[in-house]
Amino acid sequence: MRLTHVTACICLLVAVAVLFSGCTGTTDDQTTTPTPTATAAEEVQLKVFHAGSLTGPFEKVKAEFEAEHSGVTVLLEPAGSVDCVKKITENGKPADVLASADYALIPQLMVPDDADWYLTFAKNRMVLTYSNESKYADEITAENWYEVLARDGVRWGFSDPNSDPCGYRSPMVIQLAEGYYEDDQIFETLVGEHSEITVTEEGGVYTIHAADPKPDSTTLTIRPKSVELVQMIQAGGLDYAWEYRSVAVQNDLEFIELPEEIDLSSIDFAENYATVQTEAKKGDGTTLYVGSPIVYGVTVPKIAQHPDLGIEFVEMLIGATGQEILERDGQPPIVPAGGYGEVPDALQSLVEMKS
């Protein structure tokens, strides 16, 4: 009798176990899918093509932007501004932001096919940079710089007029110097004798022909990007180089500030700047860059893969964060930024429309 009772209890327990298993377990026809605890954010790469002279401030804007946008990596691609534009207009490379050291390149080369709006957001000026180890560093001034550059053994340079705005602006400054210092041999002595760059005059306008510069590379050196010359100054490969003031400040270079009449910094002398222009290569032909105050421009190209994020990057650039960074890096911001074309609604409150 006891055995029968025990057997019955065991059978009951087994039945309960089987029933419980059937309620909570799986059968051969069932599969179990784990419930995800979190979905990883999709990694986004925001591509920014920008002038080499913007490298310093843009690295800081990049850090601020990434800190506020989880999952976004900003890829900075510096180059001469003309080359930056050509990557988009001629090579079809996508960029989410395009920032040029010459704002005029955007309406001239990108609007309307590759962009339908742009902003002017910062200013600059041309300076002559050097180091304490440069020849005659203890003698050079804003009054005698062109005489120092002409001395035997002095090595100096500027960037390529065909790829970099600093490059086509440098000979403009030298040509403007002839009128300011009342010496009509400055350009020929410094540039003409050491390269294939020539100047012609018609109706009071001087055209600098620089499509095929061919510098002698002993006295005069020309490099694709102006920032490359910084390294040469620091390494002692050059004594002097033409740069933007912001680049000199960011790289702790010595520099000579020139009169506003010739340094392309002031709208008060815009008419005087316009008396010089540089002819440079464009595709199979040439184009003319007319002297004007140095103003930076930015846009989100039509080819952008992440246009909304591009607009947010521009918003940070022209807002309080970007203004502080630019000011600290020796690149005075334009406040408010100037707006042209179909400026996005998200930027309207930070922009003064110009046309």
Swiss-Prot record:
Q: Which keywords belong to this entry?
A: Signal
> Pfam family example for this protein?
SBP_bac_11
- Tell me the first and last residues of the signal peptide: 1-22
A GO BP annotation: molybdate ion transport
Q: Name one GO molecular function term.
A: tungstate binding
From what superkingdom does this record's organism come?
Archaea
PANTHER family, sorted = MOLYBDATE-BINDING PERIPLASMIC PROTEIN, MOLYBDATE_TUNGSTATE-BINDING PROTEIN WTPA
Similarity comment: family membership: Belongs to the bacterial solute-binding protein 1 family. WtpA subfamily.
Protein name (record) = Uncharacterized solute-binding protein Memar_1880
Name its species: Methanoculleus marisnigri (strain ATCC 35101 / DSM 1498 / JR1)
